[in-house]
Design a protein with these regions (language model features):
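Anion (oxyanion) recognition and catalysis
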Residues: 14, 59, 87, 146, ...
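Active-site nucleotide/adenylate-binding loops and adjacent lid/helix of ATP-dependent enzymes
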Residues: 20, 30-31, 73-160, 214-217
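ATP-binding N-terminal substructure of ATP-dependent carboxylate-amine bond-forming enzymes
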Residues: 1-65, 71, 76-77, 81, ...
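Phosphate-binding site of ATP-dependent enzymes
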Residues: 133-218, 241, 245-247
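Conserved metal-phosphate-binding beta-hairpin within the catalytic cores
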Residues: 167, 224-257, 267, 296-297
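Glycine-rich phosphate/pyrophosphate-binding beta-alpha loops
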Residues: 125-126, 184, 252-266
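Active-site "cap" helix and flanking loop/linker of ATP-utilizing ligase/carboxylase catalytic domains
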Residues: 180-233, 265-298
């Protein structure tokens, strides 16, 4: 999918009349290229904390770029730190325990559950996520995450469905329609499912309950200042349809921009075409970086 996605973005940018130079490695920034702005889609480089590589290189080379500053990218991708920020801002999130590589692995005592979720603390699309039922299994999975080069985050399994809110924030926080994945509330969604490697029963639909939408938007407005300014993002929550409980899961500051993913489909529902979406995000990013000036702040 990513090859199709990246090609679609390139075609849209070129159709705007932009002179696009294509590269597939951060090494292009080892020597300063002759460009005015970097539109990076290399958000995962296959190693820990790779999401900070492109903004760091652009900062080093004094090149304006899409996304958010390196420190904000690092904060947003550290699930534990974002959950700490959520708690500080009064946004509900599940209890959790962080196990950094090289630190002692001692059993947590401040929460318990029938099932635990163990995940890499800085991964995407549920990569490396597993289920455990007791401390012995939890400890084994922590060791596996560490062996793979990740810090490990442990949480109770949360029954419910995923709800996702696409947000742009270069000049001010602007929210697209809230989307949800209807799926079995007791099943853990997998990396293979989210990446399209296996069939999924999860169905992406628009959320239409105005009170629920207002609640999710309110939580997001509370937490967004912790990672602002950012050009675009996707905020993820878990909603239990039975208990009505909502918990913040994570935020992706430079989420998948493909037209067939959440942000593209939400924009279409809002009456914004895919080219208009990319142009809006790009204009906001360029204004944030001082490349252009916009007449109207909307």
């Amino acid at each position: 999918d990513h090859a199709v996605y990246h090609r679609e973005v390139r075609d849209v940018l070129e159709a705007m009349g932009l002179n696009v130079t294509v590269a597939n490695s951060p090494e292009v920034l080892f020597t300063k290229p002759d460009v005015d702005f970097v539109f990076s889609l290399l958000n995962r480089g296959g190693y820990l904390n790779s999401e900070m590589m492109m903004p760091l290189l652009c900062t080093w080379r004094k090149l304006p770029y899409l996304g958010a500053t390196p420190i904000l990218r690092g904060l947003s991708d550290d699930k534990h730190l974002m959950k700490m920020a959520a708690r500080a801002r009064g946004v509900p999130t599940a209890p959790s325990a962080i196990y950094r590589r090289g630190a002692p692995v001692e059993q947590f005592t401040d929460f318990d559950a029938d099932r635990f979720v163990i995940k890499p603390n800085a991964s995407s699309a549920s990569e490396g996520v597993g289920i455990a039922h007791n401390w012995t299994e939890v400890r084994e999975q922590i060791a596996e995450r560490h062996a793979d080069g990740h810090d490990a985050l442990v949480e109770p399994f949360l029954s419910g469905i995923d709800v996702e809110l696409p947000v742009s924030g270069a000049r001010k926080v602007q929210m697209l329609p809230l989307m949800r994945f209807d799926h079995d509330t007791e099943v853990l969604r997998t990396y293979a499912e989210k990446r399209g490697f296996e069939q999924t029963k999860a169905r992406l639909v628009q959320e239409t309950d105005p009170e629920f939408i207002a609640k999710i938007e309110g939580y997001t407005r509370l937490l967004a200042p912790e990672v602002s300014p950012f050009d675009y993002s996707r905020w993820e929550y878990r909603f239990n349809p039975v208990t009505k409980e909502v918990n913040f899961l994570e935020v992706n500051l430079q989420c998948n921009l493909w037209s067939q993913r959440v942000i593209g489909k939400a924009a279409l529902i809002a009456g914004v075409s895919y080219p208009e979406l990319l142009e809006t995000i790009l204009a906001g990013a360029m204004a944030r970086e001082g490349v252009i000036e916009l007449e109207h702040d909307n």
